[in-house]
A protein has these predicted regions:
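Extended, amphipathic, non-transmembrane alpha-helical segments
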Residues: 30-42, 93-103, 258-268, 272
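Amphipathic alpha-helical coiled-coil/heptad-repeat segments
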Residues: 2-20, 28, 48-49, 61-65, ...
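Nucleotide phosphate-binding site architecture
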Residues: 48, 279, 292
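Amphipathic, heptad-repeat alpha-helical segments used for oligomerization and assembly
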Residues: 241, 245-248, 262, 266-286
Length: 314
C-alpha cells in the first residue's frame, strides 16, 4: 500500500494476496467458533474442555464428587430405615406373642379348667416361647436385628446404652466418618424378655436369668410356673424398644430429607457452572454459521482479485 498525494492505494501483487489471507484467517476462526458452539449444544455443557473454563471445571468436579457421596449417604440411610422397619415389625410380632402368652396364662387360671385343659394351654404356651426366641435371632441381610451379649461376652442390661457390636453407625453426610453420625442400636429384645427370677418380675430385666424366649422345648417355662405380671413387664419393655426404634427412625428420616435438599442444591450449583444456556448458544450458533458462510464467500472472492493482475500482464 502506497501514499500518493495523500491517497492510499492498494498494491496489486501476484505472489501475495493479503485479502485472501485475512479472509482465510476469519473463515478458520469462524469455523472454530461454529464447531465449539455445536459441541456445546450437542453435549448440553458450557464447558467441554478445560480450556473453556479451567476454574469452573475444577469447582464442578468437586461438586460432582460431593453429589455422588451425598447420594451414597442417602442410599445408606434408606437401608438403615429398612433395617429399622424390619426390626419394628419383629418387635410388633414379639409383642403379640407376649400378649397371647399372658392371655393363655389368664385362661389357665380358670377354676373350671381341668388338668387336661391346662396342659393344652401349656402346649401352646411352650411353643410360643420358642417362636419368641426365633424372633430374637432374626437377621436383616445377615445383620442381627437384636442384641444378645456385649462385645466382651457379658450379658447386656435392658434400659441401658449398648456399645460395640450392638450399635450400627449411620453416616448422614457426604463427609463420611468426619461428618454427622446416627447410631442405630440393635434392640435388646432378649434382655427385655429375661428376668432375674420367676419370683420377681424385675422392671430392669437383664440378659442373664429366666427368659420367656426359649431356645428349645426343654428350656421353655411351664404355664403354671410364671405369673401374669411378668408379661406386663415384658410388654412394657417391648414398648420401650419400639419407642427407641421410632425415635431413631424419625432422626434418620430428617437426615434423609436434609441430604435430599442438599443434593438438589449441589446439582443446581453444578448446573449453573456446567450446563449451556441454550438460548444464548443458539444465537451464537446462528451468528457463527452466517459468518462462516460469509467468510467462505469472501475468500472465494478474494482469490479472484489476482486475475486482474494477470489481465494487465496480458
Amino acid at each position: 500500500m502506497t501514499n500518493h498525494g495523500g491517497l492510499f492505494q492498494m498494491s496489486l501483487t501476484i505472489n501475495t494476496n493479503p485479502a485472501a489471507i485475512r479472509a482465510s484467517f476469519n473463515l478458520t476462526e469462524n469455523n472454530k467458533n461454529l464447531q465449539a458452539s455445536l459441541t456445546r449444544l450437542s453435549s448440553g455443557k458450557r464447558i467441554t474442555k478445560p480450556a473453556d473454563d479451567a476454574g469452573g471445571l475444577a469447582v464442578s468436579m468437586k461438586l460432582s464428587s460431593s453429589i455422588s457421596r451425598t447420594k451414597a449417604a442417602i442410599s445408606n440411610i434408606q437401608n438403615s430405615l429398612s433395617f429399622g422397619e424390619v426390626q419394628d415389625g419383629a418387635l410388633q410380632a414379639g409383642a403379640r406373642i407376649v400378649d397371647r402368652l399372658a392371655e393363655l396364662k389368664s385362661l389357665s387360671l380358670d377354676v373350671m379348667k381341668s388338668d387336661a385343659d391346662i396342659e393344652n394351654y401349656n402346649t401352646e404356651f411352650r411353643s410360643l416361647q420358642q417362636q419368641l426366641y426365633a424372633i430374637t435371632a432374626e437377621t436383616f441381610n445377615g445383620v442381627s436385628l437384636f442384641a444378645s451379649t456385649l462385645a466382651t461376652g457379658g450379658a447386656i442390661t435392658f434400659g441401658h446404652a449398648t456399645t460395640g457390636k450392638h450399635t450400627i453407625s449411620v453416616f448422614t453426610s457426604d463427609r463420611g466418618n468426619a461428618g454427622s453420625v446416627v447410631s442405630l442400636n440393635k434392640s435388646a429384645l432378649s434382655a427385655a424378655l429375661t428376668f432375674k427370677s420367676l419370683t420377681n418380675a424385675d422392671q430392669e430385666a437383664t440378659g442373664s436369668g429366666i427368659t420367656i424366649a426359649a431356645v428349645n422345648s426343654g428350656a421353655a417355662i411351664d404355664i403354671q410356673n410364671i405369673t401374669v405380671s411378668f408379661f406386663t413387664v415384658a410388654l412394657e419393655n417391648i414398648a420401650t424398644l419400639r419407642a427407641e426404634n421410632g425415635a431413631t427412625m424419625t432422626r434418620l428420616q430428617f437426615a434423609e430429607d436434609h441430604l435430599r435438599l442438599s443434593s438438589a442444591n449441589l446439582e443446581a450449583a453444578n448446573s449453573r457452572i456446567m450446563d449451556v444456556d441454550v438460548a444464548t448458544e443458539s444465537t451464537a450458533l446462528a451468528k457463527y454459521n452466517i459468518l462462516s458462510q460469509a467468510s467462505a464467500a469472501m475468500l472465494a472472492q478474494a482469490n479472484t482479485t489476482q486475475n486482474t493482475a494477470l489481465m494487465l500482464l496480458g
